[in-house]
Amino acid sequence: MGRAFEYRRAAKEKRWDKMSKLFPKLGKLITIAAKEGGADPEMNAKLRTAITNAKAQNMPKDNIDAAIKRALGKDGVVITEVNYEAKGPHGVLLFIECATDNPTRTVANVKSYINKIGGQLLQNGSLEFMFSHKAVFEFPKSHLHMDREELELVLIDAGLEELDEQEETLYVYGDYTQFGSLSSTLEELKIDVTKASLQRIANTPVEFSEEQLADIEKLIDRIEDDDDVQAVFTNIA
């Protein structure tokens, strides 16, 4: 989605009490990361990042440990990552990332949300060329203990594409394949990253009116309320 809408959503979500929904979602990401790369955070950058994000949201240690144990197969639950692509109200494009133990249930739910507003679930791959897959790191400007230009020079070698600033928060952008490299470099610089994620950013963001945005946000809120949905990306400017 466009940067402006992305920041607006982030600011809005900070005001919402979403802990009951957030912890299960964060737990699934930890489980997937541990299953892919092992249960030791020191040896698994993706898991280390997932744990950092969970701690930033005050997720209890017991919940984090339980999520890692699930990856070891101790409760028999298998979590699968699945993506869905759709067209919503006013022609907005939606890229929906999910983590689920029941893909059949998840696709039925997502389809129902889209259909209720006259939207359409698209064939997977339809929107791939409309979005760029990026690694994104966020941290307060106050966490930076070096000159910004110096930081850019160091991060360029690690895959930095853009360093952006919004309301005293710095955003580091790079290709998704450079996630590990950028993460390691930020750690080496002892920069306390408050959030790290893989995002899909619209290549050609579209402007919508406030009335249209209200309709679109209602749908996004409904989709994000689903326990299986991890993230919703759009082509909103």
From Swiss-Prot:
It holds the Pfam family Transcrip_reg. It is found in: Cytoplasm. Keywords: Cytoplasm, DNA-binding, Transcription, Transcription regulation. It comes from the Bacteria. GO terms for biological process: regulation of DNA-templated transcription. SUPFAM superfamilies: YebC-like. One of its GO terms (cellular component) is cytosol. GO terms for molecular function: DNA binding. Its main location: cytoplasm. The keyword Ligase does not apply. NCBIfam families: PRK12378.1 (NF009044), YebC/PmpR family DNA-binding transcriptional regulator (TIGR01033). Belongs to the TACO1 family. This is Probable transcriptional regulatory protein WS1016.
